[in-house]
């Protein structure tokens, strides 16, 4: 479920040495499955473990995961990186904002998953987002842009050169294109 690099495991062991005996780490997602999802790691003393929690054993400690967070931590990875600028603990959880869908899920569910997990994190840097409104009978994904994308002069390039190209590569034979359903009235919220 969660991968923790050797360097991150060593970092956690060092931190846990200074805690009460049998303290582990808790890995969690606040607001899982939403655009506001945030992942975290905290100390987890023995009396804070709930019966429904799951344990993932590592060298010298366990990662405790609550049942609400578990599906959103699939494929999560924790690493500890050190360089000349210092050191940093990173937690990447690609499914935190949206639960990973099965390969046999509908085309619309799989496209929406790609939009939420791969496309929207990039658009969020400019305050933008995109959602799927429908897939037409001839395989065209109709997309609704919002936030900073609404009124942005670069939306056509983003759609054709970025999003459509990515979706056609991921769903060959299922999708034939992508179109914008958004009314693009320029306003103060627009990125460009």
UniProtKB/Swiss-Prot annotation:
Keywords: 4Fe-4S, Iron, Iron-sulfur, Metal-binding. The keyword ATP-binding does not apply. Binds 1 [4Fe-4S] cluster per subunit. The cluster is presumably bound at the interface of two monomers. GO terms for molecular function: 4 iron, 4 sulfur cluster binding; iron ion binding. It comes from the Bacteria. The keyword Metal-binding applies. Its cofactor is [4Fe-4S] cluster. InterPro entries: Fe/S_biogenesis_protein_NfuA (IPR017726), FeS_biogenesis (IPR000361), FSCA_dom_sf (IPR034904), HesB-like_dom_sf (IPR035903), NIF_FeS_clus_asmbl_NifU_C (IPR001075). [4Fe-4S] cluster binds at residues 149, 152. Belongs to the NfuA family. Involved in iron-sulfur cluster biogenesis. Binds a 4Fe-4S cluster, can transfer this cluster to apoproteins, and thereby intervenes in the maturation of Fe/S proteins. Could also act as a scaffold/chaperone for damaged Fe/S proteins. NCBIfam families: PRK11190.1, YhgI_GntY. HAMAP family: Fe_S_biogen_NfuA. This is Fe/S biogenesis protein NfuA. It comes from Tolumonas auensis (strain DSM 9187 / NBRC 110442 / TA 4). The lineage of its organism: Bacteria, Pseudomonadati, Pseudomonadota, Gammaproteobacteria, Aeromonadales. The gene is nfuA.
């Amino acid at each position: 479920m969660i991968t923790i690099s050797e360097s991150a495991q060593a970092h956690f062991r060092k931190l846990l040495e200074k805690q009460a005996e049998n303290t582990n780490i808790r890995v969690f997602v606040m607001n899982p499955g939403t655009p506001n999802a945030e992942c975290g790691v905290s100390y987890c003393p023995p009396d804070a473990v709930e019966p429904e929690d799951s344990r993932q054993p590592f060298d010298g400690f366990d990662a405790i995961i609550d049942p609400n967070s578990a599906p959103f931590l699939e494929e999560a990875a924790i690493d500890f990186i050190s360089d000349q600028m210092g050191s940093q603990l990173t937690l990447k959880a690609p499914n935190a904002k949206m639960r990973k869908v099965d390969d046999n899920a509908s085309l619309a569910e799989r496209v929406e998953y790609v939009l939420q997990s791969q496309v929207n994190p990039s658009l969020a840097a400019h305050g933008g987002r995109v959602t799927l409104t429908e897939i037409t009978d001839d395989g065209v994904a109709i997309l609704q842009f919002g936030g900073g994308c609404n009124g942005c002069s670069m939306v056509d390039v983003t759609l054709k050169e970025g999003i459509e190209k990515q979706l056609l590569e991921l769903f060959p034979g299922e999708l034939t294109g992508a179109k914008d359903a958004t009314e693009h009235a320029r306003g103060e919220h627009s990125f460009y």
